[in-house]
Amino acid sequence: MAIPNIVSVSSIYGTTVNSVLTTTLTTTLVTAATDKVHKINLIRCANITDNDATVTFDQEVSGTHKIIANEITVPANSVVDIVDKSNGFYLQETDLIRGGCSAGSTVDCTISYEIMDDA
């Protein structure tokens, strides 16, 4: 298992996943596959209710969890970008992003990223 060299990638695949956040803050949203690097471009939260909610995201690296965003308020019926192109980051192989919300089925989450491979 080697980390791909992003200078000489052989393929880049654009990917988007959508999830409904639950009150379980340990829900895995994205996992980087073995021998791949994921460039996270966007984490967008859309509150689909008439009540404010808070969201929390973390990144797991080699079993250690580090907060990306902690209890960020997503106002009722609005959208908040947690990560965008100006502050994107990389997930190395087997790293993951987890997230949750103060109220289940309140916030829809969109994560857009590129999967890079040097095979």
Language model features: what each stretch is:
Residues 1-37, 100-119:
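C-terminal interaction-tip segments
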Residues 80-87:
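Exposed aromatic-hydrophobic patches
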Residues 72-80:
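Short proline/glycine- and polar residue-rich coil/turn motifs
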Residues 31-32, 44-52, 101:
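Asparagine-centered strand-capping/turn motif at beta-strand->loop junctions
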Residues 41, 51-56, 105-109:
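Short beta-strand/loop motifs in extracellular/secreted proteins, especially
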Residues 38-47, 95-99:
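A short beta-strand element within beta-rich, extracytoplasmic domains
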Residues 88-103:
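Noncatalytic modules at the cell exterior or secretory-pathway interfaces
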Residues 50-71:
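Short, surface-exposed beta-strand/strand-loop-strand elements in extracellular ectodomains
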